[in-house]
Amino acid sequence: IVDTVLDHLLKIMDFLACNLDSEGGTGCLRALYGDWNDSINELGGTRDPGKLFGSGVSVMATLHFYQNCKEMAAILKKIGLHKEKAAGYSRYRRQIEAGLFQYAIDRNAAQERRVVHGWGDKLSYKIGSWRDPDNRARISSTSHAFWVLSGMIHTDVTMRESILKAFEQLDSKYGL
């Protein structure tokens, strides 16, 4: 059997959709083995016996999937195929939006906002937050960048100031 490019893309989307966090209730994409950023490689793990992965999430990967849902729905509409899948991708986007707004935006005591890089199993800790597991505040450039690149910024334009402030804090003589 030879798959088309479209078949391949649909299989990827199905795989990602099957890995949205339903158990933890965040609706975001579980980290599994991690993403390219070594700082979150353990986010997908769990201490639960018999389970390979937990409910830890990569915000960057979630935002990739969020963007892919929009793009795939547009492709399917354009070619007039898989209307049910296109509708599903729109539902996933709404689910992801709700989850990201509830869990990915971290606030400090002054109510300043930051987009975290991710969180561990059962929201046990966050990375790129105002208070990481080592009690240090960190800023993740990738989660903030993908908040903009994925179009998530259009769902709440007030995040613009928070994102600009995060990048200003990351700016140094060595770059971001």
Where are the regions that the model predicts?
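Catalytic cores of carbohydrate-active enzymes
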Residues: 64-176
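Active-site acid/base region of carbohydrate-active enzymes
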Residues: 1-57, 84, 88-119, 165-176
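Aromatic- and histidine-enriched alpha-helix N-cap/loop-to-helix transition segments
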Residues: 4-7, 53-67, 138-142
